[in-house]
Amino acid sequence: MAEEIITPVYCTGVSAQVQKQRAKELGLGRHENAIKYLGQDYEQLRARCLQSGTLFRDEAFPPVPQSLGFKDLGPNSSKTYGIKWKRPTELLSNPQFIVDGATRTDICQGALGDCWLLAAIASLTLNDTLLHRVVPHGQSFQNGYAGIFHFQLWQFGEWVDVVVDDLLPIKDGKLVFVHSAEGNEFWSALLEKAYAKVNGSYESLSGGSTSEGFEDFTGGVTEWYELRKAPSDLYQIILKALERGSLLGCSIDISSVLDMEAITFKKLVKGHAYSVTGAKQVNYRGQMVNLIRMRNPWGEVEWTGAWSDSSSEWNSVDPYEREQLRVKMEDGEFWMSFRDFMREFTRLEICNLTPDALKSRTIRKWNTTLYEGTWRRGSTAGGCRNYPATFWVNPQFKIRLDETDDPDDYGDRESGCSFVLALMQKHRRRERRFGRDMETIGFAVYEVPPELVGQPALHLKRDFFLANASRARSEQFINLREVSTRFRLPPGEYVVVPSTFEPNKEGDFVLRFFSEKSAGTAELDDQIQANLPDEQVLSEEEIDENFKALFRQLAGEDMEISVKELRTILNRIISKHKDLRTKGFSLESCRSMVNLMDRDGNGKLGLVEFNILWNRIRNYLSIFRKFDLDKSGSMSAYEMRMAIESAGFKLNKKLYELIITRYSEPDLAVDFDNFVCCLVRLETMFRFFKTLDTDLDGVVTFDLFKWLQLTMFA
């Protein structure tokens, strides 16, 4: 068969962002309506290839060295020498996608350090429902084969349908990366390729945690527990997690490479990911004993200590209960006491699933909320609490906890509301090839004081954080893709502040709330408004004679000041203020000032108009000096935010991002002329809107002419 090269269609720019938001509101990105990754439609592409008799070749992730990697697996690396790309049909006469269902033996690690990903894939094989949410049915190398396959992955709040061709990296006639033990099944190798595609390359998959794979295959949120310092109610947490259909994994840390695969005296394997499949209390000689059921998906080596299959402890358990609990299949599944579990294992991971992944009506489900956000230099990247001058500019989110946990959920403890917070930074694996790795991230939780409870969702300012300590926080700031922590707090309102550790570190993030009871959430942001003074109505007689004399001197014979003359005047005046950092006013900024003040529409300023502008600039100068806190002659981007508010404008964080991008220098400094231009522009746009909003409903409608008139000449 010939190959058909398909080139993806990309949509870029602001219009794409608007289009994406509208589509999301209509349900695009849910699992049942997954986004076609890079615009590639599996059914259409497959049909086209079948019709033309060609095999699919994916130019969005082509079979070239750059798809392998950028450093250790880069184009000039010795590790990639001799690698070719071949289809399974070129390697075998009868390749298979899946044989007799997916099993752990389908997943053997190759020459890539992505065991974390393979452990997550192996866990999927234990749950057919979850597996086939990722690996859709109906794919094969026989009926309807066209060299194209697809998989569904969760990516930062959205499900995407990822198309791949079946050209796989081969060296010495064998698959370089993931392969099956039998050598004739290829679903796992193709799934790995799809995951490499969304992350930019195979090398981008090197190094990670199983929880990352769990989340991208389920859309769930993961909790980590170091068992040496686990909370006292961990057994109850495990019971609740199993009750909610969560995936649980645990492992024994290794101290060196030599420890990997080492088997302990009681037949536990170090460095392997075990699954927790059950928990039960049993009556043992008159006392209740907490048990944990485990499974080693990698083999049939089983625990031989207390409560193992052949242990004597079972002889002291009621026969009926014993039959209900005892594992009869030799499949690596076994029971052990919770006390032994805490002593023998090192770490526990719990992946809490979203309601859409849980089809059973008997399973209790989490209440979930997801927010997307950004950290941008100078506007929303304030760093952690160690930086009080800027911490307050970070994005903020409010949680309202009303319902306490059920009394029987956690025993006799004090009542409270349980929830999990998870902060995830986006696209960092994909950006490794550009030298950008994980930022150090975390979050803090603040209790809203009584006087602010129920108030509008306004962004909290610096004074609040200077006066109030955090009520809770992430366990640490760390350079992982996700930081998550379980909390239990009294009913009330709380504000969550996600941040990077240091200020001015840029990135996109997802913040997720998983609560056991319903909880109200909202993003805190200021409402856009302007407290502008009424436009002055002056006559020439009211203007000071000294100012009139100055105007006559500046305006010339026509007694009006043009844009060019205004620029000369302002730059001459500003040059005398040696304490100001400025490059002078541009013609464009002076044109904006004239447009704001020009009442008769002749493109020039008369005496009254110039007088009003002059007084306004003097006011701007006093504000500028007030917020130039270090007297450097310029303001920082964060100082500018406070200065804009002092001038009467309240803006949301997105507008501040745009303003800083447009009016600050590369070092985030804002000089006086840019500050004036910004305020003039803001006032002009607010006044235009106010004029057009005749019914005062906060909405105006433009035809194309009015839109162009406003944007081109305002």
Curated annotation (Swiss-Prot):
What detail does the entry give on cofactor binding?
Binds 4 Ca(2+) ions.
- Residues binding Ca(2+) 2, per UniProt: 316, 318, 323
Q: Which residues carry this modification: Phosphothreonine?
A: 354
Q: In which tissues is it expressed?
A: Ubiquitous.
PTM summary: Undergoes calcium-induced successive autoproteolytic cleavages that generate a membrane-bound 78 kDa active form and an intracellular 75 kDa active form. Calpastatin reduces with high efficiency the transition from 78 kDa to 75 kDa calpain forms.
Q: What is the required cofactor set for this protein?
A: Ca(2+)
* Domain spans labelled Calpain catalytic: 55-354
Cellular component GO terms held in the UniProt record: cytoplasm; plasma membrane
Task: List every stretch annotated Domain IV.
Answer: 543-713
User: Known InterPro entries for this protein?
Assistant: C2_III, Calpain_cysteine_protease, Calpain_domain_III, Calpain_III, Calpain_III_sf, EF-hand-dom_pair, EF_Hand_1_Ca_BS, EF_hand_dom
* A Pfam family of this chain: EF-hand_8
The chain positions of domain EF-hand read 541-576, 585-618, 615-650, 680-714
Reactions accelerated catalytically: Broad endopeptidase specificity
Record-annotated site: Cleavage:
15-16, 27-28
Residues binding Ca(2+) 4: 628, 630, 632, 634, 639
UniProtKB keywords: Autocatalytic cleavage, Calcium, Cell membrane, Cytoplasm, Hydrolase, Membrane, Metal-binding, Phosphoprotein, Protease, Repeat, Thiol protease
Q: Where is this region: Linker?
A: 527-542
Q: Give the UniProt family note.
A: Belongs to the peptidase C2 family.
Q: Which protein is depicted? A: Calpain-1 catalytic subunit
> Which source organism?
Macaca fascicularis
